[in-house]
Structures are given as structure tokens and as C-alpha cells.
UniProtKB/Swiss-Prot annotation:
Keywords: Repressor, Stress response, Transcription, Transcription regulation. Negative regulator of class I heat shock genes (grpE-dnaK-dnaJ and groELS operons). Prevents heat-shock induction of these operons. Pfam families: HrcA (PF01628), HrcA_DNA-bdg (PF03444). This is Heat-inducible transcription repressor HrcA. InterPro entries: GAF-like_dom_sf (IPR029016), HrcA (IPR002571), HrcA_C (IPR021153), WH-like_DNA-bd_sf (IPR036388), WH_DNA-bd_sf (IPR036390), WHTH_HrcA_DNA-bd (IPR005104), WHTH_transcript_rep_HrcA_IDD (IPR023120).
Length: 334
């Protein structure tokens, strides 16, 4: 647990490093903190902060820089988001693809980092469902959409089922849940599982426990904008290996999509610092994200990707405002 003096010095160090990008020494920190402490006292506090893993000393400098752990403590307990005068912007109610592209561009232009938007997920409504036994504990689920599109999905279960049990489960789903999305079916099954025979309930839960990507038949689309902005960020431009890793992430998309999917399950803005998420193990990269809605339902996520040395207070405002603009534009689309 940090005392007040240590917190003030850590806060001053993080803010100075974010602003200037240079390791912060004890004399600079003494001036920045406003505390009447000797450089020797500040050095002792900095040594304690370093022992706690909150700051680190680059080999080429006597100053200190925040670690991902230090940034996290700063963001969670010390960051004050003051209302900043952002440019007046508006996203017009248009086709979803255009709203998404405009939002990604807006995020990158306001942040001067990379804007990212996960496109709205299509709700996978089914009209008819069938189960076919392929082998022991392995079954084919056939789902027919209202438009007549057919999706096939192989599932594996802990127990084995006879064809008569498969027919019984399919008949129950078709009679009670046809016309609903898979998400709605999942929610209904949670409430009604006690009323169903155990083996049938387990089979139906296995059938619908697939993500929207699999059932829609297409990968979630993710739109990036402003990737070249990272070329102007010293944290990346000074180390080509960092740039290559960042652009590999943007090209492959999978890890970014997983991170955005995690964010979609939370309320409000989320901040992922460095490699703490385990999904994007990149110590020099942070993501500030927030979900957006259509008619009150979360359908996607957007955010800003940049260096861990980013002005988090400003990024939070940019992401929060953009998520509200996108929600409004998509909800009021004619």
C-alpha cells in the first residue's frame, strides 16, 4: 500500500513521462510534484517504487519510466478525467458500414493513434434446426435461417445421444424457440433448463453455445484507421521490431477481435495496458475501448490503440464520446 507521498510522486512521474517521453529524474520529479523534498528523499521513494515494480530504470538513463503495473495503478486510482473541449463532431445515420468506417477515422484523427471498430454482429435467427449423429459424442447441427440459408456446425458433447434423443431435442427447439436469435435461445435455456430432462438440456445448450461468428457464417469485421500514425510515435519509430509486431496484429486481427469481444461484455470504457490482458501480449501497446449499442443492445466495440505512454484521460473521452455517437447514428438510421 503506497503512502500519500509515494502516490503523488508516482502520479507526477507518470504524467511527466506521458507528456515528454523521457525518463524522469529526481530533480525533475521534485519540480513536477510540487513537494518540498530533497532529491535524496525522492530517490529513496523512487527506489521503493521500483522495488514494487511500478517504475523501471532504462539502461541508458538515470531517470525512471512507468511500467505497465505503474500505469495500471495510475489509471485505476490517480487519473482524473477532466472535460476537455473536443471538436464538435457528428456521425450521420447512414448504412452501418459507412458509420463504422467514419467512426474509425474519427477515432484516429482525434487521438492521433489507431482507431478500431468492430462492426455490428448479425443476429443469427433460426427458423429450423436438426441434429444428425456422426459418431459417438459427435453430432452435426443443421440450422436454417428465415432466408433459407443453411449453416452446418459440428459439435462435441460429454455424453452420447441416440437419434431419437436428437429428434426430441430438435422438436423442442423448433416448437419453442424458432424465430429467436441464438443469444435469446441461450438466455431462455438458462431460465428453463430445470424443466427439461438433463440429457436433452445439455444437448441443446451444446448446440447453441457457439459464438455469433460461427453461426453467422462470417468473421466479425474489424475496421482500422490511422495505422500510419504509429510511425510518428517515438515509442514505435525508434524500434522497428515494435512497429512490425503492431502491424502484424492489425493484419491478423484475431487477437484484437478477442480483446474487443471482452470489452463488449463490460459497461463503459475499459483500458488494457501492455500485455496484462494476455490476449494481446504486447508490453508497449495499450487499448482504450468501449461497447456501442443499437436500440439499447450492445452490438459491437470500438477503441483507440496506441503506446502505453498515451494521455489516458483524453483517450477515455474520445472513446466514450465516439461510442455514444455511433450508438446514436445506428439507432436512428432510417
Amino acid at each position: 500500500m503506497l503512502d500519500d507521498r509515494s502516490k503523488l510522486l508516482l502520479k507526477a512521474l507518470v504524467e511527466r513521462y506521458i507528456a515528454e517521453g523521457q525518463p524522469v529524474g529526481s530533480r525533475t520529479l521534485s519540480r513536477a510534484s510540487g513537494l518540498e523534498l530533497s532529491p535524496a528523499t525522492i530517490r529513496n521513494v523512487m527506489a521503493d517504487l521500483e522495488d514494487l515494480g511500478l517504475i523501471a530504470s532504462p539502461h541508458t538513463s538515470a531517470g525512471r519510466v512507468p511500467t505497465a503495473k505503474g500505469y495500471r495503478l495510475f489509471v485505476d486510482t490517480m487519473l482524473t478525467v477532466q472535460q476537455e473541449q473536443l471538436p464538435t463532431v457528428q456521425l450521420m445515420p447512414e448504412q452501418p458500414q459507412k458509420v463504422i468506417a467514419n467512426a474509425a477515422h474519427l477515432l484516429s484523427s482525434l487521438s492521433q493513434f489507431v482507431g478500431v471498430v468492430m462492426a455490428p454482429r448479425r443476429a443469427s435467427v433460426f427458423r429450423h434446426i436438426e441434429f444428425l449423429r456422426l459418431s459417438e459424442k459427435r453430432f452435426l447441427v443443421i440450422i436454417v435461417s428465415p432466408d433459407g440459408d443453411v449453416q452446418n456446425r459440428v459439435i462435441f458433447t460429454e455424453a452420447d445421444y441416440s437419434q431419437s434423443q436428437l429428434v426430441e431435442a430438435a422438436n423442442f427447439l423448433n416448437a419453442n424457440y424458432a424465430g429467436l436469435t441464438m443469444e435469446q435461445v441461450r438466455e431462455r435455456l438458462k431460465l428453463e433448463v430445470d424443466k427439461l430432462r438433463g440429457e436433452i438440456a445439455a444437448l441443446m445448450q451444446a448446440a447453441v453455445s457457439v459464438d455469433s461468428e460461427a453461426m453467422s457464417g462470417s468473421q466479425d469485421e474489424v475496421v482500422f484507421s490511422g495505422e500510419r500514425n504509429l510511425l510518428s510515435v517515438s515509442d514505435f519509430s525508434s524500434d522497428m521490431s515494435h512497429l512490425r509486431r503492431a502491424f502484424d496484429l492489425f493484419e491478423q486481427k484475431t487477437q484484437i477481435l478477442r480483446l474487443l469481444d471482452i470489452s463488449s461484455r463490460a459497461e463503459g470504457v475499459r483500458i488494457f495496458i501492455g500485455g496484462e490482458s494476455q490476449v494481446v501480449p504486447f508490453e508497449e501497446l495499450s487499448v482504450v475501448s468501449a461497447p456501442y449499442e443499437v436500440d439499447g443492445q450492445v452490438v459491437g466495440t470500438l477503441g483507440v490503440i496506441g503506446p502505453t505512454r498515451m494521455p489516458y484521460d483524453r483517450m477515455i473521452q474520445i472513446v466514450d464520446i465516439t461510442s455514444k455517437l455511433v450508438s446514436n447514428a445506428l439507432s436512428h438510421r432510417k
